[in-house]
């Protein structure tokens, strides 16, 4: 099947599976389907094995969001062309960068982005621990506001409800609020050993 893409590239062959669209490597489009699938730059796999067999970096455990090498100037230029065009046209005024600390070089990336964006207002979606500062070298206006909303939430929560919430926590987990740090650590380990196992191993 062919679909039109950018005018300068003409038409391209793609594989479609419901709403998934996969590019077809040049020169393989005339092969029988079972051979064609084996000759691509990717391997199709049953979705339930993704956590065990993934061989690329993902955004957490979201299989459709692959990490790309934005530290490579060509990759940066190609992946940011539309966003920077929208900024220059005044269609968007600011940028939000989700989880930049997952990048190979977050400081270098944010500096490069700030320069390419002409000093546009940029925020980083980074959830800071209560005693964690935003890295000084990041060229961002600040975070997207989770730390501020946490403080605002605290103003609106009645401290008298702590006993009832503690009882609910004990009912749901078998542990009390005093063990909160242990519960958090256990949850993090479950994620690392479960949905992120392919990235760790």
Which residues are covered by each model-predicted region?
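Alpha-amylase-like alpha-glycosidases and glucanotransferases acting on alpha-linked glucans and related
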Residues: 1-94, 100-201
């Amino acid at each position: 099947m062919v679909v039109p893409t950018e005018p300068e590239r003409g038409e391209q062959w793609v594989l479609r599976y419901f709403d998934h669209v996969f590019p077809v490597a040049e020169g393989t489009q005339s092969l029988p389907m079972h051979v064609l699938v084996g000759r691509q730059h990717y391997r199709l796999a049953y979705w339930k094995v993704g956590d065990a067999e993934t061989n690329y970096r993902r955004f957490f455990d979201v299989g459709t969001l692959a990490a790309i090498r934005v530290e490579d100037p060509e990759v940066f230029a190609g992946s940011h062309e539309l966003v920077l065009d929208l900024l220059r046209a005044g269609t968007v005024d600011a940028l939000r960068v989700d989880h930049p600390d997952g990048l190979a070089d977050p400081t270098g990336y944010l500096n490069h982005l700030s320069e390419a964006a002409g000093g546009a207002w940029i925020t980083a979606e980074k959830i800071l621990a209560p005693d964690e500062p935003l890295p000084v070298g990041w060229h961002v206006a600040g975070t997207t506001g989770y730390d501020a909303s946490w403080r605002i939430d605290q103003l609106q929560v009645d401290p008298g409800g702590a006993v009832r919430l503690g009882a609910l926590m004990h009912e749901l987990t078998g542990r009390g609020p005093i063990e909160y740090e242990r519960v958090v650590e256990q949850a993090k380990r479950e994620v690392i050993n479960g949905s992120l196992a392919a990235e760790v191993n």
